[in-house]
């Protein structure tokens, strides 16, 4: 009888915690690695974690968190103190990120306002395939499943990734600045990204690639979906 009471108490406590998190506006992100290699996941906020194939890292965003971004790092080595480096996506040589990652890196971006806004971004280039899956089945689940590294133009290639034209050439046209801020059409380079991943943000003014979902939705971010 005592065992039954104990189980009932644990179930009630778990439910209470879950309800409290929902009421408090906590948004949960499950970061999953389905790649056939290790990915060092990174998040702002969140920090970072090594994910071997099949592993998941959960990040809970506190109520009032206006925005977040997540990405995967590859080719990393870290010492026992969490210091090291990554071939792509490195964030100041730290396992637990407190600054944005080095380009190129595929990004999952999230903004909280009157509702949730999110996108898969290739504006900073590409390193690994990525998808965002909302728990709300009525919301779009954008993905970039292609290996853009395989079709990357030589002038954009770096070890382990494919840079954006803005990062490489730094011109107003490619970066949608100054005279191009209000009228910035796609370029031959951004079209390569768009053709490979139609649901992803291919350059700074590719606004059709932003998606919305009701507040209170949780998400999974999948590397190599």
From Swiss-Prot:
Signal peptide range: 1-26
Keyword NAD: no
InterPro entries in UniProt: Osmotin/thaumatin-like_sf (IPR037176), Thaumatin (IPR001938), Thaumatin_CS (IPR017949)
Disulfide bonds: 35-224, 76-86, 91-97, 139-213, 144-197, 152-162, 166-175, 176-184
A Pfam family reported for this protein in Swiss-Prot or TrEMBL: Thaumatin
UniProt key word Disulfide bond: yes
Alphabetical GO biological process terms: defense response
Alphabetic keyword roster: Allergen, Disulfide bond, Pathogenesis-related protein, Plant defense, Signal
Region (IgE-binding): 146-157, 158-170, 178-191
PANTHER family, per the entry: OS03G0233200 PROTEIN
Record-given protein name: Pathogenesis-related 5 protein Jun a 3.0101
Taxonomic placement: Eukaryota, Viridiplantae, Streptophyta, Embryophyta, Tracheophyta
């Amino acid at each position: 009888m005592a065992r039954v009471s104990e189980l009932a108490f644990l179930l009630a406590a778990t439910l209470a915690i879950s309800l409290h998190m929902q009421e408090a506006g906590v948004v949960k992100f499950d970061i999953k690695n389905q790649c056939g290699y290790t990915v060092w996941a990174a998040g702002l906020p969140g920090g970072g974690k090594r994910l071997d194939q099949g592993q998941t890292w959960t990040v809970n965003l506190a109520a009032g968190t206006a925005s977040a971004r997540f990405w995967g790092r590859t080719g990393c080595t870290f010492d026992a103190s969490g210091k090291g480096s990554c071939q792509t996506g490195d964030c100041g040589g730290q396992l637990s990120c407190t600054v944005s990652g080095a380009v190129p890196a595929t990004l999952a971006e999230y903004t909280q306002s009157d509702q949730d806004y999110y996108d898969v971004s290739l504006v900073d280039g590409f390193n690994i395939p990525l998808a965002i899956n909302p728990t709300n089945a009525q919301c779009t689940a954008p993905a970039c499943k292609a290996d853009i590294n395989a079709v990357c133009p030589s002038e954009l290639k770096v070890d382990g990734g494919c840079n954006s034209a803005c990062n490489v050439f730094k011109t107003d046209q490619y970066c949608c600045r100054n005279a191009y801020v209000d009228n910035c059409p796609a370029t031959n380079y951004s079209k390569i990204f768009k053709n490979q991943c139609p649901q992803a943000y291919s350059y700074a003014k590719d606004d059709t690639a932003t998606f919305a979902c009701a507040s209170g939705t949780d998400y999974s971010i999948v590397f190599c979906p």
